[in-house]
Swiss-Prot record:
The lineage of its organism: Viruses, Duplodnaviria, Heunggongvirae, Peploviricota, Herviviricetes. Residues 21-31, 316-326, 1408-1420, 1444-1453 have a biased composition (Basic residues). It comes from the Viruses. Residues 113-131, 190-201, 495-506, 893-907 have a biased composition (Low complexity). Residues 227-240 have a biased composition (Polar residues). This is Probable nuclear antigen. Residues 77-97, 135-147, 355-364, 1078-1087, 1100-1112 have a biased composition (Basic and acidic residues). Residues 1-41, 71-394, 437-506, 520-548, 882-907, 993-1141, 1223-1242, 1348-1475, 1585-1608, 1630-1665 are annotated as: Disordered. Residues 179-189, 202-220, 272-299 have a biased composition (Pro residues). Residues 365-374, 454-466, 479-494, 882-892, 993-1004, 1027-1043, 1116-1127, 1385-1407, 1454-1474, 1652-1665 have a biased composition (Gly residues). Residues 336-354 have a biased composition (Acidic residues).
Length: 1733
């Protein structure tokens, strides 16, 4: 319920609810139909599970939205609601206010609608009547009292299909009421966009169709789909059974109708739950009605509302919530708890998740465009309307998801990517993540049947694609991401939206339009928004996405029939061809692909058939629909026409409205004509066959062709599609962004978010492409991250596109690979990775082969905790992401190859000494993406693993993943997740970024890896172990994950590698030792392995090969050979994973050993393996090194410039600079590729040092982060921003930006936004004393002393705020009581809960609570060994105390040992124990005193000579210590649950100092985030033991895990994902509603605030995710409810991969990474995390 009310909040981002609602809104606005379809299915699979997962998605999306929405709070709603009758209601931008208007409209039409509504709910045809629909839409408000109470629920459950409008209104209103309905029903509804649908029903059903604009409608639809589709799918049975089935049947009086209530989708879906095949007329009829089109969102809302109890939209929202609770019963209890908090509660969450896959995935939609199909819009970040602002807002979110904060899309994208990806991953975990939309049980399992847009009910309902697609699919295709959901915007719902489809169409069209709107708003064709920016903005449907808005109008008579027939036809017969094609396609690349393609193909074909007129039709009307000029296309698309068509649309009479709604309503029973058939048959199969057409349609992700089939079929040209400025770059960008199979959304997202940097927009492209959308998430995973299976057309399309476009690389994958995942990944790599890799690191900026992207993407994906693994593995058994593709396969070698691709591999030849990752985890409250304040530097070159760990989150950005993905995904996803070097190695995949990796990679990788890593140390384990178990949870993956993460991960491998091994000899150590022992000054210094001891790659390779059979292979270009197996997606992926595991283990070990100058020898190797994940060595090191290269610089250089300087230089010079200004300066004058040159240049010549090479992705990331961070953060005087203020505020903090490069490059002064003028420099704050100190020294110093406190270290436990001057709050709160930590000893850490990540943390934090605790204990011993190995990884875990506690496993990481849920380490604040805001580093080896002395010495100036945190002499460049520079360490977070972002220094596996983990907590409850502080967490390789370390501390637990972030959000109990969003949101919120989290039932998870699905609020889990159980948390079954993870599988959230998951994730991943990044495996990863909010 809160969903909607917060909608407005969301719009304004005023409240948590807002965020959540925002998320919902995202969902609602999201092109829910397609996403709904897909997402619903996915979500539906396990309602609760999804809830848990989606919460993440939702959270993330919300976060993204939240971040992006604040600037345009109104717009998203507007977009969604576009209620203004005068304006095209499809114009989301106008919806916010119009929304209210719409609400009024709702009120107005209700009378008429009332009659119809009441009747319609059951009579689909009646609802079909536009008037009825409209009225119904409106009716809910009016009818609510009458109809809602008695039949609202029933109607909502039944009405949505027949009485779609009521459902719509009810749902939307309900949605509104939940959030704002009760408080402000009128405004709320309008804000909720639900009203938009309802209020402006009069205006037109487009609201439903415009669900995208008015996300709530999509949400409802989505929900409906989710509810219906989900219900109708296994998820429906599973999740919705809990929710709808239990709640609805009971509340609704019947699930069947309840499904109907879902806008017919529900009905249609509803039967599926009971019996997937049953796509009974009841379901069909309801869905078909035009009202359902508008209803889809309402349906979603209905579902939502149903979940809420179906109370009246306005008033019954809450009441309904209760009612829903009663009705929902099981689901309601937990869900309601959440719902209560969220207003939507679990149901909503679920809906959100279900819908969130699309909606949540596109959840940014609300913020992005506040509208636009949630998915579509979100995808594009809906940057058009709100997205634009989102771009600004996305800053933080960007980091989060994509770490691309620059573009609104980023936040949106990443979150969404994470969300959808997560959701997809979750769904995949549920067996169908591949296509978020095509996740019906039928589709879900097969993932083909349901088709992408087949959405939830896909498989279950209507042969999966038959009815599903039409009804849901149609709608999904059209509105949600359903089919071609990604492209949904491109004439997705053409033929598929028929009647029910109309609803779908409306939803699709409007939702898509709305989604498009996010883009469309900018482009005129908002309604058509689904098309990604309107072909021509004016073209109604705007096939910006390479799709043409094909509005096939259905004969008026048929309209009624449509309700019954079209729906059935669409479902069963109308689009038999389309359906068949869809199915066929589903059979091809994947269910999703088929569905996607079909819907979109049908639409495309139809559009094509109709001709440009149809596509471009005047005012968006397709030529064929001249009579319907007022139709949604025109109205929706032609924003300009909005006003006139708007009323016509809504007010023009139900008829018109219905028509508008019906996107491509072909006479029912009549197959879509040739084009559709052709398109479907050809497009459908072709996509699978990689036919050129697909290429054209899909546009290979290049700017060549809008990869939207529809686009191509429609003949929409790139110029046509993306040309319209409204959707900046929708055309070209869209085209390129569209990439594979995700074109529309991705393109839209890319275009929207990347509009500014559309050509790849330094970060925009990266972010946009990276997170283009929910589908995009999926697609994006496969695409951008190169981890997902591109089940939707993405895969096939990608394949086709590659083939068509002759993309050799793609061709390589495509050529018989046809393994959607791998192929998709490959293509994705090129497209997505290309987007990401290209943009980010891969091939230079965006250009060049994208293979790199794959690895990076993989790593990123894994790191991001994307559903990549969940997605990839689940999505495609072939863990394309897992081993194939990302990482090992590095699809296309992209990952590893990426590394070797020179860019990546070359970059990371040796263990990077310093990984500089600039991650701007800015969660600007304002929502403006400021410059990223996050700069991650891993001085110490923790093994690439660690760097990867760091990068994992950035992985996609930094192809370090590419080795980052390669690294993290070393084995593709597995790489990240498994070998992932990043994943496992860096713990990123395995843990840390691995979290996501494990979640993502963890899933597949986890699965294999789990076995493997379990055995092999579960590189994946640490982060993903729990994630695996939690994230993957119950799934095969889950099993994998847990061991991996929980036991192998952090504990075993990480620790197994030996406290000394990894920690001692880990990459960090190895590097350090190498350095120390002169393994190669230069190479050793930054070059990653190659520089290692100057042994060149050859040496390293030899060593690597010798040590890790896959080091080179697994890590190398083939890297995926084992991991991804270029040709064998599944087996290769698995094999790769295994190989990667073995190779990674060996390779990593070797890497650690060798890369570490072999200093670690076995230990190093082990550590390396652990840290680097065999792949890391190859791709890992290469990628990681590559990534690491980013951050790694010669120790000397580091010394010279200081860690941060190196980091900045690296990030800036390499990435940021290159991306921004070109790496010439820093990198030696040229692009990313020349790692060595760069490195030499940067490190040697320029002294950028530390920057062996910054992946373009990383650079982009940094750049974007820096550029996208909240300005507030970076503003001078902010205390965080460079400038005197910062310096002053942070007496000791010096902005590394002082690094000459930064300064010069930026032209800013040394301390100012030197980095790429993005203020990166501003972002990097290094204690002045540390400025010139080598990374280790810096880390030590940072650890040893309070950053601002001067040499003297505060007493341990004394976190004496140096004076929270400036926004930063406690500028030097980071009191690293080095001694204190040691004093705390292992136990201390555990007290801190570092145990969590760090202690239990290592796997503990990550692992299930129990495991966590155990792990913690395990690590505890490790912690005990700080001095030994684990100790070596002293890391600051921001939020060290926080007491992750909650998650014994995840929580274990945390909070006070977090063994106890949340209280383990002192309860929620357990971690707080470390003293909020107190940053203390434990000197691992040296013990507290020694460490303190060393740290103090280092800080005091002895840094170079000072002891490292370990207490042993610091070795320049040795990143053993964690330098956590917290811009501010207030109690902030602590207040919330444990405290603020505390920098917890987890030393030792257990993060023994964990308790003492220095936690810098911002004074404000919000914590750093709240404070907008920058937290520079530099976890040096000192966190080698996978256990401790930020990752251990917080990664798994999310940002604050176990102290990890001290106050970081405690890991979600469910997903273990520390949701900064949640945490951040919760920070203040818990303060406001202290009991919120704590009181949340375990399953419910913290409510609005914590992970929604956090199984337990994590001890109240600091909000955020607090709560999720480790497994659940990461995933597994429930969606993480984390605000950031919401709706996403927490898997990522576990998902250490911050990427899309959420900035928090990023931070968490980063934090986690360093420590447990590799699950404790990537000790050598130093994170310089500047967490700025």
């Amino acid at each position: 319920m809160n969903l909607f009310r917060p909608l407005s909040h969301r719009l304004s981002l005023p409240s948590t609810t807002t965020t959540r609602d925002h998320h919902h809104q995202q969902h609602h606005h999201h092109p829910p139909p397609p996403p709904s379809r897909t997402h619903f299915t996915t979500i539906t699979t396990s309602g609760r599970w999804l809830q848990r997962q989606f919460p993440v998605l939702t959270t993330t999306v919300f976060f993204s939205l939240f971040l992006s929405f604040p600037p345009h709070p109104p717009r998203p709603p507007q977009d969604h609601h576009r209620p203004t009758p005068a304006r095209d209601h499809r114009d989301p931008r106008d919806h916010l206010p119009p929304t209210r208007t719409r609400r009024d409209h709702q009120h107005r039409p209700p009378p008429t609608t009332t009659t119809t509504t009441i009747k319609d709910p059951q009579h689909p045809q009646d609802p079909l009547l536009l008037p009825t629909k409209t009225l119904q839409e409106e009716d809910p408000h009016l009818l609510r009292p009458t109809r809602d109470p008695p039949s609202a629920k029933t109607h909502h459950h039944q009405d949505p299909p027949g009485g779609g409008p009521p459902s719509t209104s009810s749902h939307h209103h309900h949605q509104d009421p939940p959030g704002g309905g009760p408080p402000s029903p009128p405004p709320r509804p309008s804000t909720s966009s639900s009203s938009s649908h309802q209020g402006p029903p009069s205006t037109r059903p487009p609201p439903p169709q415009r669900p995208p604009p008015r996300w709530p409608p999509p949400s409802p639809q989505k929900i409906s789909e989710t509810r219906a589709g989900s219900e109708n799918t296994a998820q429906t049975l599973f999740s919705h059974s809990e929710n709808k089935l239990f709640s609805h049947p009971m509340g609704e009086g019947g699930e069947g109708d309840r499904g109907t209530a879902g806008g017919g989708e529900g009905d249609r879906d509803d039967p599926p739950p009971p019996s997937p095949p049953p796509r009974p007329p009841p379901p069909l009829p309801p869905p078909p009605p035009p009202p359902p089109p508008p209803q889809p969102p309402p349906a979603g809302g209905s579902a939502r509302r149903r979940r809420r109890g179906g109370g009246p939209p306005g008033r019954g929202g809450r009441r309904r919530g209760g009612k829903r609770r009663r009705a929902e019963g099981t689901e309601a209890a937990a869900a309601d708890a959440e719902e209560e908090e969220d207003g939507d509660g679990d149901e909503d969450e679920d809906e959100d998740r279900a819908e969130g896959e699309g909606r949540e995935d596109g959840g940014e939609g609300p913020r992005g465009a506040g509208g636009g199909a949630g998915e579509s819009e979100s995808e594009s970040g809906r940057a058009e309307g709100a997205p634009r602002s989102a771009e600004q807002q996305v800053g933080v979110a960007g980091v989060l998801g994509l770490l691309v904060v620059r573009d609104g899309l980023h936040l949106d994208g990443p979150e969404r990517a994470a969300g959808p990806a997560v959701a997809a991953a979750d769904a995949d975990d549920l067996h169908r993540v591949p296509v978020l939309a095509g996740a019906g049980p039928g589709a879900r399992g097969p993932r083909g049947p349901v088709g992408l847009h087949g959405a939830p009910g896909g498989g279950a309902d209507a042969g999966l694609e038959g009815g599903k697609v039409p009804e849901h699919g149609r709608r999904g295709a059209r509105g949600g991401d359903g089919a071609r959901g990604q492209h949904q915007r491109g004439g997705l719902g053409v033929g598929l939206q028929q009647r029910r489809g109309a609803e779908g169409a409306q939803l699709g069209r409007q939702a898509l339009g709305a989604a498009e709107l996010g883009e469309a708003p900018a482009a005129a064709g908002d309604e058509d928004g689904p098309q990604r920016g309107a072909e021509p903005p004016a073209v109604g449907r705007a096939v910006p996405e390479g799709g043409a808005r094909v509005k096939v109008r259905v004969p008026e008579p048929e309209r009624g029939a449509l309700a019954g027939h079209v729906l059935a036809a669409v479902h069963g017969g109308e689009h038999a061809l389309a359906v068949g094609a869809r199915r066929q396609r589903d059979r091809g690349p994947g269910p999703g692909a088929g569905a996607h393609r079909v819907a979109h193909v049908v639409l495309a074909a139809e559009a094509q058939r109709l001709g440009p007129g149809v596509q471009a039709g005047e005012g968006g009307l397709h030529a064929g629909e001249a009579g319907r000029a007022h139709d949604g296309a025109r109205v929706q698309h032609g924003r300009a026409e909005l006003a006139a068509p708007g009323p016509a649309h809504g007010a023009l009479g139900g008829r018109v409205q219905a028509d508008a709604d019906v996107d491509v309503v072909v006479p029912h029973g009549r197959a879509v004509r040739g084009p559709v058939l052709d398109g479907v048959q050809h497009d459908e199969p072709a996509p699978r066959r990689a036919e050129p057409r697909a290429e054209v349609l899909h546009g290979a992700g290049e700017a060549e062709v809008p990869r939207r089939e529809q686009q191509h079929p429609l003949g929409v040209e790139a110029a046509d599609v993306g040309a319209p400025g409204p959707v900046p770059g929708p055309g070209v960008r869209v085209r390129r962004a569209e990439a594979v199979g995700e074109g529309g959304e991705q393109r839209r997202e890319a275009a929207a978010a990347r509009v500014p940097g559309r050509a790849r927009g330094a970060l925009g492209g990266l972010g946009a492409e990276l997170l283009v959308g929910q589908r995009v998430v999926e697609h994006h995973h496969a695409h951008v991250l190169g981890v997902g299976y591109l089940p939707h057309p993405g895969g096939a399309a990608a394949e086709r596109g590659a083939a068509a476009r002759g993309d050799v690389r793609q061709g390589g994958r495509v050529e018989g690979e046809r393994r959607a995942p791998e192929f998709g990944e490959d293509l994705l790599v090129h497209e997505g990775a290309g987007h990401l890799g290209r943009a980010v690191g891969g091939e230079g900026r965006l250009g060049g082969p994208r293979r790199v992207g794959l690895a990076g993407r993989d790593a990123a994906e894994a790191a991001v905790g994307r559903g990549v693994l969940g997605h990839g593995p689940e999505r495609a058994p072939e863990p394309v992401v897992l081993g194939g593709g990302g990482g090992g396969g590095q699809q296309r070698g992209s990952g590893v190859r990426s590394g070797p691709e020179s860019e990546g591999a070359a970059l990371a030849p040796g263990p990077p000494v310093l990984f500089v990752v600039a991650v701007a985890v800015a969660v600007p409250a304002e929502g403006r993406a400021g410059e990223p304040l996050v700069l991650l530097a891993v001085p110490g070159a923790a093994g690439p693993g660690r760097a990867a760990l760091l990068l994992a989150p950035l992985g996609r950005w930094v192809r370090a993943g590419g080795g980052g993905a390669g690294v993290a995904g070393g084995a593709g996803e597995a790489g990240l997740g498994a070998g992932a070097g990043l994943g496992a190695g860096a713990g990123l995949g395995a843990g840390g970024a691995g979290g996501p990796g494990a979640g993502e990679a963890g899933g597949g990788a986890r699965r294999r890896r789990r076995r493997r890593w379990d055995d092999e140390a579960g590189l994946l384990g640490p982060e993903r172990g729990q994630a695996g178990r939690g994230l993957r949870g119950p799934g095969p993956r889950g099993g994998l994950g847990e061991p991996g993460r929980g036991h192998v991960g952090r504990g075993e491998e990480g620790r197994g590698v030996g406290p000394g091994g990894l920690a001692g000899a880990g990459p960090v150590h190895a590097v350090a030792h190498q350095r120390r022992h002169g393994a190669g000054d230069e190479g050793d210094r930054v070059r990653g392995l190659p520089p290692l001891g100057r042994a060149g790659p050859g040496d390293r390779v030899a060593e690597r090969e010798q040590r890790g059979r896959h080091l080179l292979e697994a890590g190398g270009p083939e890297g995926g050979r084992g991991a991804g197996g270029r040709g064998q997606p599944e087996r290769a992926g698995q094999q790769a994973l295994e190989d990667a595991a073995a190779g990674q283990d060996a390779g990593v070990r070797q890497l650690a050993g060798h890369a570490a100058g072999l200093r670690g020898g076995e230990g190093g190797a082990d550590a390396g393996a652990e840290g680097l994940d065999g792949r890391l060595p190859g791709a890992g090191v290469r990628g990681a090194a590559r990534v690491g290269h980013v951050g790694v610089g010669p120790a000397e250089a580091l010394q010279d410039e200081g860690l941060l300087g190196a980091i900045v230089a690296a990030a800036h010079g390499h990435g940021a600079h290159r991306v921004r200004q070109g790496p010439e300066r820093v990198l030696g004058g040229h692009g990313v590729p020349d790692v060595r040159q760069r490195r030499g240049h940067a490190a040697g010549d320029e002294g950028a040092v530390a920057v062996g090479r910054v992946d373009p992705a990383l650079a982009e990331l940094v750049e974007a982060l820096v550029g996208g961070l909240h300005p507030r953060v970076l503003q001078p005087g902010h205390g965080l921003a460079g400038g005197p203020a910062v310096d002053e505020a942070h007496e000791g903090l010096v902005l590394l930006p002082r690094v000459p490069h930064l300064r010069d490059e930026d032209g800013h002064g040394p301390g100012r936004g030197a980095v790429a003028g993005r203020g990166l420099a501003d972002v990097v704050l290094v204690p002045e004393p540390l400025a010139g100190v080598p990374g280790a020294a810096v880390a030590d110093a940072a650890v040893g002393r309070r950053v601002g406190a001067g040499p003297g270290l505060p007493e341990r436990g004394e976190q004496r705020p140096v004076g929270r001057r400036g926004p930063v709050g406690h500028e030097r709160e980071v009191v690293v009581g080095g001694a204190a930590l040691p004093a705390r000893g292992p136990g201390g850490l555990r007290g801190r809960g570092r145990g969590g990540r760090g202690g239990g943390g290592g796997g503990g934090g990550r692992g299930p609570r129990g495991r966590g605790g155990r792990r913690r204990r395990r690590w505890r011993p490790g912690a005990g060994e700080w001095g030994a190995g684990p100790d070596s990884f002293v890391f600051f875990s921001l939020g060290g105390g926080r007491g992750r506690g909650g998650r014994g496993g995840r929580g274990g990481r945390g909070r006070g040992g977090g063994r106890a849920p949340r209280g383990g380490g002192g309860g929620p604040g357990g971690g707080g124990r470390a003293g909020r805001g107190e940053v203390r580093v434990a000197a691992a080896a040296a013990g507290a005193a020694e460490a303190a002395a060393a740290a103090e010495g280092a800080l005091s100036g002895a840094a170079p000579a000072g002891l490292s945190l370990r207490g042993r002499p610091a070795v320049p460049g040795e990143a053993e210590s964690v330098l956590v520079l917290l811009g501010a360490a207030g109690d902030g977070l602590d207040g919330d649950g444990g405290g603020g972002v505390g920098v917890g220094v987890g030393v030792g596996g257990d993060g023994a100092p964990g308790a003492k983990r220095p936690r810098i907590e911002p004074p404000r409850g919000g914590g750093l985030v709240e404070q907008g502080l920058a937290v520079l967490v530099m976890v040096t390789t000192a966190v080698p033991s996978g256990g401790g370390g930020a990752a251990a501390a917080g990664r798994r637990d999310r940002p604050g895990g176990g102290g990890g972030w001290g106050s970081g959000p405690p890991p979600c109990r469910r997903c273990g994902h520390r949701c900064w969003l949640c945490w951040w949101r919760r920070g203040p919120r818990p303060r406001r509603r202290p009991g919120l989290t704590d009181r949340v039932p375990p399953r419910g998870g913290p409510s609005p605030r914590g992970c929604r699905g956090a199984g337990r609020a994590g001890g109240g889990g600091r909000g955020g995710c607090g709560g999720g159980r480790a497994p659940g948390a990461a995933g597994g079954p429930g969606l993480c409810r984390c605000e950031c993870c919401r709706g996403r599988r927490p898997g990522p959230g576990a998902g250490p991969g911050p990427g899309p998951e959420d900035e928090v994730t990023v931070l968490g991943a980063l934090m986690e990474s360093p420590t447990g990044g590799p699950g404790g495996r990537g000790p050598g990863l130093v994170l310089l995390l500047v967490f700025v909010v």
